[in-house]
Amino acid sequence: MASQPSSLKKKEEKGRNIQVVVRCRPFNLAERKANAHSVVECDHARKEVSVRTAGLTDKTSKKTYTFDMVFGASTKQIDVYRSVVCPILDEVIMGYNCTIFAYGQTGTGKTFTMEGERSPNEVYTWEEDPLAGIIPRTLHQIFEKLTDNGTEFSVKVSLLEIYNEELFDLLSPSSDVSERLQMFDDPRNKRGVIIKGLEEITVHNKDEVYQILEKGAAKRTTAATLMNAYSSRSHSVFSVTIHMKETTIDGEELVKIGKLNLVDLAGSENIGRSGAVDKRAREAGNINQSLLTLGRVITALVERTPHIPYRESKLTRILQDSLGGRTRTSIIATISPASFNLEETLSTLEYAHRAKNIMNKPEVNQKLTKKALIKEYTEEIERLKRDLAAAREKNGVYISEESFRAMNGKVTVQEEQIVELVEKIAVLEEELSKATELFMDSKNELDQCKSDLQTKTQELETTQKHLQETKLQLVKEEYVSSALERTEKTLHDTASKLLNTVKETTRAVSGLHSKLDRKRAIDEHNAEAQESFGKNLNSLFNNMEELIKDGSAKQKAMLDVHKTLFGNLMSSSVSALDTITTTALESLVSIPENVSARVSQISDMILEEQSLAAQSKSVLQGLIDELVTDLFTSLKTIVAPSVVSILNINKQLQHIFRASSTVAEKVEDQKREIDSFLSILCNNLHELRENTVSSLVESQKLCGDLTEDLKTIKETHSQELCQLSSSWAERFCALEKKYENIQKPLNSIQENTELRSTDIINKTTVHSKKILAESDGLLQELRHFNQEGTQLVEESVGHCSSLNSNLETVSQEITQKCGTLNTSTVHFSDQWASCLSKRKEELENLMEFVNGCCKASSSEITKKVREQSAAVANQHSSFVAQMTSDEESCKAGSLELDKTIKTGLTKLNCFLKQDLKLDIPTGMTPERKKYLYPTTLVRTEPREQLLDQLQKKQPPMMLNSSEASKETSQDMDEEREALEQCTEELVSPETTEHPSADCSSSRGLPFFQRKKPHGKDKENRGLNPVEKYKVEEASDLSISKSRLPLHTSINL
C-alpha cells in the first residue's frame, strides 16, 4: 500500500496527455440542398467516432477513432462547456496555465464553439443565452467562483489576432487596426513569449467582458467563401490572466497566478472548393501554412524527434508552452457529417488522433510574495522612466548608418548563434532534467527501501517470536512423534504376523475356490444336460398326453354314448309305446265324464254368482257414497302437500340426473382405463410367462452366487479371523443344501407357472370381454336413463304446474263420475245376469265338441306309434356298424402310444447313466485348521502424559533458545548498521559526481555479502537438547536433526 501513492506521484511527474474532444455539427442548409448523406457516427458512451469511407451502401469499410470525449450533432453548448471547460477552470484557479483551442475545417463550428452567438432580439443575457460559447461562459464562471470564494483577485484579458503571419491587437485603443506587434522570447520562461505592445485590459465584472468580446469580434477579419458566409480568416488567441492573493499561516501575503488561453484557429480549406481567389487565396495559403506547421510540431512531439519546428510559424511559437510544455491543454476538433467533406473530416480526425499522444507536464505557477512583486514592478517602472528620459533629452547613442547596419548584421548573426546555443542548452537541460529525474527516482526508491526495511525488521522480530513458539511446539510434536514411532514399530510386528496368517488363509481359500470351480463346472454341465433333457422329455410327454387324451376321450365318448343311447332308446321306446297306448285309452274314457262333471260345477257357480251380484249391487252403492266423501277430504289433505313434495322431488331429480350424466362420463373414462389396463395386463402376463422361464434359467445359475458369497467371506476374513473355520464349514453346508433345495422345485415351478399363466391369460381375456360388454350396457342404460329422466322431469314439471290449476275441475269431474258409476253398476248387474245365461248355453255346445275331438285323437295316436317303432329299428342297425369301426381306431392309437412310451424310457435311461456327471474328490481341498495370531494391539500413551514427561526435560532447552534469540538480535543490529552505511554512501554527493564508483572500502560491501565470523559457533549451539535426548533414548532409529539460526537477505 505504501508503494501506490509513490506510483501515482511518478505518473503525475511523467506528465499528462493532451485532452482531445471531437464535436460533430448537424447538416447546414447548403448540405441539405446538395442531398449529402451522413458518413459520421458518434458514440458518446463509448467515446468513438466511426467514418464510412466507401459510401452509403457499404457499411463494412469503416474507420473508427477513439477520443477522450465525443459530442454528436444534438449536443448543446452548455454540454460541451460542462464536460470540457469546467474541470480546466478549476485548475486555472489553482494556479495552472491552461489552453483550449478549436481546430477543424472551415465552416464546421469552431468560432461557434469558442465564442458562440447571440440569440435574436437579445431575449437572453450572455450568461443565460443557450447559444453562448466557451469564452463568455468561462469569464462568467470565473467571476462567480472568485466572488463566492471571497478571495481578492484581479482579471486581465487580451485578444490577439494572427492574420497572414502578422500579429494584431484586437483590443488596442488606437483606431489603427493595422499596427503590427512584435514577439520576443520570455527570459523568465524558456518556452514562453512576450508580445510587445499587446494591450491587457483589467476587467472588474462580467459586463465589461461581454463588451470586450463584442469589440474584438467586430475587429476580427472575416470574409465570405463558398464554404462559410462568415469565415474567419485569422487565428485568435483570447488570454485571461488571474492574480489571486493568498495569506499563509505566518501572515505573509502571496500572489497566485493562473492563465487561460482560448484559441480559435482559422479553418483549413480547399481553395478549389471554397472559391478563394487573389487575396482570399493568399489568406488561405497562410492559414494552411500555419496549420501545416502545427501538424509538423504535433508529429515531432509524438515521434520525440530532437528538433521541433516551433519557430516556423507565429502560431506554433505562441502555443509552444501548450504543446509539450507545462500547460494543461485541450483540443476541440470540429467536423462535418456530410459526405462531400469526407477528406477534410478524415484529415481532422487523423490530426486530432495524433495529438492525443502529446505529453505535457503541467506545473503550478510560482507564487510571488507581495514584496517581490512590488520590487519587480518598481524595477520595470524605473527602466521605463530611464527610457522615457533618454527619449526626451535625446541622451541616447547616435551612430552612422553604415555602422548601424553592420551592428544590426552582427546582432542578427549573434541572434542566430544565440538561437542555436539556446537550442543546445535546451537539449542539455533536458538531458540534465532526465538525469535529475533518474536520481530522484533512485532516491525515492531508496527511501522506499528504507521504509520497507524497517517494516521487514519489525516483521522479522515478530517472526522470531513466532519461531520460538513454533520451536517449542516442534519439540513437543517431535517427542510425541517418537513415542508414536515406537508404537508403530510394535504395531508393524503384529501386522506382519497377521499378514502371515492371512497368507495361509488365502491359500486355503484358493483351494476352496478351486473345489467350487470344479463343482460349478459339473453343475453347469448337469444343468445344461438337465435343461435339454427336460425340453425333450416335456415335448415327448406332451405328445403322449395329447395322444392319450384324444384316444381315451374318443373311446369313452363313442362307447359310452353309443351304449347308453342304444339301451335308453330301446327301453324308452318300448315304455313310451306302452304308456302312450294306456294313457290314450284312459283319457278317451275319462274325458266325457270329466266334462259332464265340470259343466255341472259351472252351472252351480253361475247360480251363486247371480245371488252375489244382487248383494254386491247394494254394497257398491254404499261404497260409492263413502268414496265421494273420502275423495273430497283426500283432495284437501293429501293432494296439496303432495304437489309441493312433487316439486321438491323434481328439483332433486334434476340434481340426480346431472350427477348421473357426470357418472356416465366417469364410466366412459373408466371404460377407457379398463381397456388400457386389460391390454397392459395381457402384455404383462405374457412378459411374466417369459420372465418366469428366464428366471428359472437364471435360478440354475445361483451356484455362481456361491463364489460371490465366498468373496464376501474373504473380505470380512481380516475382521473375523477367530470365527473363520466354523463359518466356512457352516456356510459351505448351507450353500450345498440351498443348491439342492433350489434344483428340486425348478421343474415343478416351471410347469405350474406355464399352466397358471395360460389360465390367467384366458381368464383375463374372458373378464375383459365381460367387463367391456357390461360397461357398454351400463353406458347405454345410463344414457337411456338420463334421457328418460330428463323427459320425466320435464313432464312432471308440466304436470305439477297444471295439477294445482286442475284440482277444482278434478273434484267436479269426480262427483260426476260417481253419479255415472252408480247408474253403471245397476246396468252392470243386469248385464251380468244375461251373460251367465249365455255361458250356460255355450258349455252345452262345448260338451258336444269335446266328444268329437276325442274320437279323432285316438285314431291319430295309434298311427304315430306304429311309425315310431319302425324308426327305432333303423337306428339300431346304424349304431351297431359305427361301434365296430370305432373299436378298430382305438386299437391303432394304443399301438402308437406303446411306441412313444418305449422311446421315452430309453432316453430317460441314457440321461441318467451317460449325460449326468459325478463330482470325483481330488484330495486337494484344505482341511480345517486353527490359526494362531495376536489379538491385542499396543496403544501409545496419552498426549498429556507424554507432554508431562517432556516438561521435566525442558529447562536446558529454554536456555539454548534464549541464547539463540540474543544471537539473532545481534545479527539484525549488524545488518541494520551495514544497510544504513550503504544508503549513506549511495546518497552522498560523491556518488552523484562519480556514478561509476563502487563501494570498495573496508565496510563497502553490502551486508548480505559479508561473512559472519560467528556463524559456525551458532550452528554448534543450535543443537536441540530434546534431539539429544531422542538420540540417547532411541539409538536404533538414529534420528539427529540440527537447528540452524535464521539468516535474512534483503536485495535492494
From Swiss-Prot:
GO cellular-component term (any): mitotic spindle
Transmembrane feature ranges: none
Domain Kinesin motor: 17-358
Record note on modification: Phosphorylated exclusively on serine during S phase, but on both serine and Thr-925 during mitosis, so controlling the association of KIF11 with the spindle apparatus (probably during early prophase).
Region: Disordered, residue numbers: 950-1026, 1033-1052
Cross-link (Glycyl lysine isopeptide (Lys-Gly) (interchain with G-Cter in SUMO2)): K476
Protein's recorded name: Kinesin-like protein KIF11
SMART domains documented for this protein: KISc
GO biological process: cell division; microtubule-based movement; mitotic centrosome separation; mitotic spindle assembly; regulation of mitotic centrosome separation; spindle assembly
Any Pfam family the entry gives: Microtub_bind
Self-association state and partner proteins as the record states: Interacts with the thyroid hormone receptor in the presence of thyroid hormone. Component of a large chromatin remodeling complex, at least composed of MYSM1, PCAF, RBM10 and KIF11/TRIP5. Interacts with RARRES1 and AGBL2.
Chain sites annotated for binding ATP: G104, Q105, T106, G107, T108, G109, K110, T111
Residue stretches of biased makeup (Basic and acidic residues): 1016-1026
UniProt xrefs under CDD domains: KISc_BimC_Eg5
GO molecular function: ATP binding; microtubule binding; microtubule motor activity; protein kinase binding
Stated role: Motor protein required for establishing a bipolar spindle during mitosis. Required in non-mitotic cells for transport of secretory proteins from the Golgi complex to the cell surface.
Location(s) in or outside the cell: Cytoplasm; Cytoplasm, Cytoskeleton, Spindle pole
Family to which the UniProt record says this protein belongs: Belongs to the TRAFAC class myosin-kinesin ATPase superfamily. Kinesin family. BimC subfamily.
The keyword Phosphoprotein belongs to this UniProt entry's keyword annotation: yes
Record's keyword terms, sorted: Acetylation, ATP-binding, Cell cycle, Cell division, Coiled coil, Cytoplasm, Cytoskeleton, Isopeptide bond, Microtubule, Mitosis, Motor protein, Nucleotide-binding, Phosphoprotein, Ubl conjugation
